[in-house]
Amino acid sequence: MKRSSMIKGIQLHGWADGPQMVEVAEIAAGSFETVWLSDQLQSRGVAVLLGAIAARTGVGVGTAVTFPFGRNPLEMASSMATLAEFMPEGRRVTMGIGTGGGLVSALMPLQNPIDRVAEFIAMCRLLWQGEAIRMGDYPQICTALGLREDARASFSWTSKPDVRVVVAGAGPKVLEMAGELADGVICASNFPAHSLAAFRSGQFDAVSNLDALDRGRQRSRRGEFTRIYGVNLSVSADRDSACAAARRQATLIVSQQPPENLHRVGFEPSDYAATRAALKAGDGVDAAADLLPQEVADQLVVSGTPGDCIEALAELLGYAEDAGFTEAYIGAPVGPDPREAVELLTSQVLPELR
């Protein structure tokens, strides 16, 4: 497989100006099949941006990823089905869903996350099939949202929209659930268990938890299943700016991961202790990122000029392919300037991988 042929999508983020995001997506649509948007609650509205991108570009769209906490599955199911109405032949909508990251857990407790994701998926699927659902059949959602147990809802207007459901995660429980219930899985390179560090250390098979995914697949009634690898990358003509953005992204990861997860792929406490201490002291992400060694960030996020990124990206995609992944996307932070990053990726990086 050509390395570039694995890369089907690119992930953008709702922190940038909305119209600018749509313009960047227009550039990306010439080289990518899917534009993914992150969902962060405190950023711009993901459904609005995906709708604008779908209507303007005709590219496939997806969430990478949404989550069940603070989200109403009725609204999300409706948004996904509506987006599917904009898809031209050969393109589709993907609902990527996970258990919620640090920005979500800072706002609310993430109780029973695996069960909440499973209920969310089950409710959406029945709504997309046009079936009436009873709220009490989804007890955790019903309780969390204050819904009436005997209330019913249905989407009479849907016609079995083509919405793919993929689950993002790294732990054994979420991956086993993904294998059983979803149409695919997302594993991102900035998580230690699925990182370049895990591959290079020879620990990927031991720490990736993909055996749990396989157990879930054995129980699944769903035929199609796609293993998607998210390559976290930061590219710019300005190497220092690209690397700074990568360190910031890596800081968000090393600050949240249990030390044992980092140690299992070769990181020592001295690699990230100063960064974690700075965040704990309230110094902010940028200040903490300045304390993270670049060589640590490089194991989690590919970064630099286009020339810097090509070799590392090819290496990482090779590992991912050998591990059974068949699809990939370019993920956060993409670059300090999203427009520049997409232009460099499409004009200089991807052609060199062919």
Predicted features by range, described:
Residues 1-354:
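Active-site-adjacent structural elements that line small-molecule/cofactor binding pockets in enzymes
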